[in-house]
Swiss-Prot record:
Ranges annotated as biased composition (Basic and acidic residues): 417-436
Family annotation (Pfam families): ALMT
Subcellular location: Membrane
InterPro entries found in the cross-reference section: ALMT (IPR020966)
Name of the featured protein: Aluminum-activated malate transporter 10
Keywords: Ion channel, Ion transport, Membrane, Transmembrane, Transmembrane helix, Transport
Gene from which this protein is expressed: ALMT10
Family: Belongs to the aromatic acid exporter (TC 2.A.85) family.
Keyword Ion transport listed: yes
GO cellular component: plant-type vacuole membrane
Topology within the bilayer: Multi-pass membrane protein
TM stretches of this protein: 66-86, 88-108, 123-143, 148-168, 173-193, 210-230
Organism annotation: Arabidopsis thaliana
GO biological process terms on file: malate transport; monoatomic ion transmembrane transport
Length: 497
């Protein structure tokens, strides 16, 4: 039965209970394919969104400082935008409140040092370039028809000088961003002043908006959950010293351990992580010195340079010797290169005879233990910012272990006992004595390489000790007043002549 309802024709059928049901036509093949594709696309999109949200949550959970930085940026922008919303404040800066917002976006960084660096560079460069631009504009207006020539020559000369200064390493390390802002501001003021009547008033308004933006950034980054670049660098040095000690102990212990199959998977993973600890020290060079830690507009600043911009905080004074952290990091990386070669010795295809391993094992383990104790003591000095009262004894123990290992190296066994199998009892009775065979060079070479690397690593650790001692003296670390007890107290370090 067909009925017409609201201009549409529909078909109904009668069922057993006396009612009718509407017949719905089956969807075509193209429509079913469209619905299937729609569901597939929505499923893929939802999976991607869920994956992105999980990744974003994991990043924030691993490093809450990133979340804090985002909140601080939002707070700074909210405060500076008041100058744009409120008419009295907006008129007070001559309608240029947007420059304050742009300043916050550009200069706000993840730690105090980077924010201070960019704020000071931006303010000083803007004031200096604006003043020079106004002076050049005045000179150009007094020159009559040569106005365009004067402006063009001044732009060329100042742009050349500022750009060339960015290639000077000492200048680039601290004022690279300021040089770029100087070029930009000077060009805008000097060239733009050719078509602007109230140039001085415009320059004053721009400077005031930049001052407002940088002031808000400095206040928020210092007084609201501050993240100090100096503290981050200090903790990085401390952690790397601990990782070097663990890696040194792990490499030597792994080489001299007996060949046993371990059944504890978690223990193997933990041991492998300690063995690879030296890689963290090698990769941290970018954070300490050379590789870009914070990038903006193509520029990079090292962690030590950023720390120099920060005010006094915690146990760090205003003129804290941050340059020495780069020196300490370089000394640690030299130790890490030795450990990298030590880890290669573990994977040598040529196995040294057990007799040779037993000959060197005790002396190598003793030197490894003495060296790792020094590294851990250095880490403890950095952690507590205190001078060590037992460092001289630990260095004396390490030097004694080096001498002992060198003496052991002079008495390398050149022959090894190898009993030969005999085919018959008669031959066994005739020749029952063990025969000696000489060892080849490639059998002794792995252990000799290990020994030389341990001795070289001890010398490099001595360099790290000197660098940390220099830092402790210049930074006025407190003297360790705790009375040290143990076996080391009975020993006396060698007297210096």
């Amino acid at each position: 039965m067909a009925t017409q309802e609201a201009g549409k024709l529909e078909w109904r059928i009668s069922v057993d209970n006396g009612t009718t049901e509407r017949l719905v036509p089956r969807s075509g093949l193209s429509k079913r394919i469209f619905l299937w594709l729609k569901d597939l696309v929505m499923k893929v999109i939802m999976e991607r969104v869920a994956k992105f949200m999980r990744k974003a949550w994991r990043i924030g959970a691993d490093d809450p400082a990133k979340v804090v930085h985002c909140l601080k940026v939002g707070l700074a922008l909210s405060l500076v935008s008041i100058f744009y919303y409120m008419r009295p404040l907006y008129d007070g800066v001559g309608g240029n409140a947007m420059w304050a917002i742009m300043t916050v976006v550009v200069v706000f960084e993840s730690n105090v040092g980077a924010t201070f660096c960019k704020c000071v560079n931006r303010v000083v460069a803007t004031i200096l370039a604006g003043s020079l631009g106004i002076a050049v504009h005045w000179v150009a207006t007094q020159s009559g028809k040569a106005e365009v020539f004067v402006i063009g020559c001044s732009v060329f000369l100042f742009a050349f000088a500022a750009t060339y200064s960015r290639f000077v390493p000492s200048f680039k390390a601290r004022f690279d961003y300021g040089a770029m802002i100087f070029i930009l501001t000077f060009s805008l003021v000097s060239v733009g002043g050719y078509r602007v009547d109230k140039l001085v008033e415009l320059a004053q308004q721009r400077v005031s908006t930049i001052a407002i933006g940088t002031s808000i950034c400095i206040i928020i980054t210092v007084f609201f959950c501050p993240i100090w670049a100096g503290s981050q660098l200090h903790r990085l040095i401390e952690r790397n010293l601990e990782k070097l000690a663990d890696s040194l102990d792990g490499c030597v212990a792994e080489y001299f351990k007996e060949n046993e199959v371990s059944t504890n998977r978690n223990e193997d993973e933990n041991t492998n992580m300690k063995l690879q600890g030296f890689k963290c020290v090698l990769n941290s060079k970018g954070t300490e010195e050379a590789m870009p830690l914070i990038r903006f507009s193509g520029f990079s600043f090292s962690q030590a340079n950023l720390a120099r911009w920060e005010p006094a905080h915690g146990s760090f004074n205003f003129r804290h010797p941050w340059k020495l952290y780069v020196k300490i990091g370089a000394a640690m990386r030299r130790c890490a290169y030795c450990l990298e070669n030590l880890s290669i010795c573990i994977n040598y295809e040529t196995e040294a005879p057990d007799q040779v391993k037993n000959h060197f094992g005790e002396a190598c383990m003793k030197l490894s233990s003495a060296s790792s104790k020094i590294l851990r003591e250095l880490a403890d000095m950095m952690k507590n910012t205190r001078k060590s009262s037992k460092m001289d004894f630990l260095v004396f123990d390490m030097n004694s272990a080096v001498q002992e290992l060198q003496e052991t190296l002079k008495n390398v066994p050149i022959e090894t006992n190898k009993p030969e199998e005999v085919p018959s009892e008669e031959e066994n009775k005739v020749d029952s004595e063990e025969r000696t065979t000489s060892m080849s060079l490639h059998e002794v070479l792995p252990v000799a390489t290990l020994v030389s690397l341990l001795i070289e690593n001890a010398a490099r650790i001595q360099t790290a000790v000197e660098a940390v001692d220099e830092l402790a003296n210049l930074a006025d670390f407190e003297q360790d007043s705790k009375k040290k007890t143990g076996d080391n107290n009975t020993k006396q370090p060698p007297l210096s002549s």
